[in-house]
């Protein structure tokens, strides 16, 4: 789930 990493960065 790459989306999780995106949200973590934001």
UniProtKB/Swiss-Prot annotation:
Any one cellular-component term (Gene Ontology): extracellular region
Tissues in which the UniProt entry reports expression: Brain.
Keyword Transcription assigned: no
Gene Ontology biological process: neuropeptide signaling pathway
Compartment annotation: Secreted
Swiss-Prot/TrEMBL keywords: Amidation, Neuropeptide, Secreted
Residues with Arginine amide modification: 10
Taxonomic superkingdom: Eukaryota
Keyword ATP-binding: no
General function of this protein: Myoactive peptide. Increases the amplitude and frequency of spontaneous contractions and tonus of hindgut muscle.
Protein's recorded name: Tachykinin-related peptide 6
Organism: Rhyparobia maderae
């Amino acid at each position: 789930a790459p989306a999780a990493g995106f949200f973590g960065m934001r």
